[in-house]
């Protein structure tokens, strides 16, 4: 068995981590040991926040739908209930898009929901 020296692989590994840590503040972008921890933590935050992003956007859509619905004298929960009873299968993302960019179409959807509730 010949002796394995780690010079090339270690340098490559260090370089990879330090490239991932580019733009970090201070030692986090320069010192391998610190940069490695920073990159691992950044990966954890990124993984977690990819999940949180979905929740955040759903909350944003609900806020927008609620604001637009209240301009038509109906609450968000009543609107969703009415849409379910009317058999309208628009998701919250689409409803929020209508509420912001196509107010006439949103008004028609609200009328449909109100009719189903009456």
From Swiss-Prot:
Keywords: Ribonucleoprotein, Ribosomal protein, RNA-binding, rRNA-binding. CDD domains: Ribosomal_L20. One of its GO terms (molecular function) is structural constituent of ribosome. GO terms for cellular component: ribonucleoprotein complex; ribosome. The keyword Ribonucleoprotein applies. GO terms for biological process: ribosomal large subunit assembly; translation. It holds the Pfam family Ribosomal_L20. SUPFAM superfamilies: Ribosomal protein L20. InterPro entries: Ribosomal_bL20 (IPR005813), RIBOSOMAL_L20_CS (IPR049946), Ribosomal_protein_bL20_C (IPR035566). Belongs to the bacterial ribosomal protein bL20 family. Binds directly to 23S ribosomal RNA and is necessary for the in vitro assembly process of the 50S ribosomal subunit. It is not involved in the protein synthesizing functions of that subunit. NCBIfam families: rplT_bact. This is Large ribosomal subunit protein bL20. It comes from Francisella tularensis subsp. tularensis (strain WY96-3418). The gene is rplT.
């Amino acid at each position: 068995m010949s002796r394995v020296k780690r010079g090339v692989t270690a340098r490559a590994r260090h370089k990879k981590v330090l490239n991932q840590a580019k733009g970090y503040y201070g030692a986090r972008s320069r010192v391998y040991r610190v940069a490695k921890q920073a990159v691992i933590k950044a990966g954890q935050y990124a993984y977690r926040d990819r999940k949180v992003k979905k929740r955040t956007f759903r909350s944003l859509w609900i806020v927008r739908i609620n604001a637009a619905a209240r301009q038509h004298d109906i609450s968000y929960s009543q609107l969703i209930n009415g849409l379910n009873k009317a058999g309208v299968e628009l998701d919250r993302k689409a409803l929020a898009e209508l509420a912001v960019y196509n107010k006439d179409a949103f008004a028609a959807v609200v009328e449909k929901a109100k009719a189903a509730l009456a």
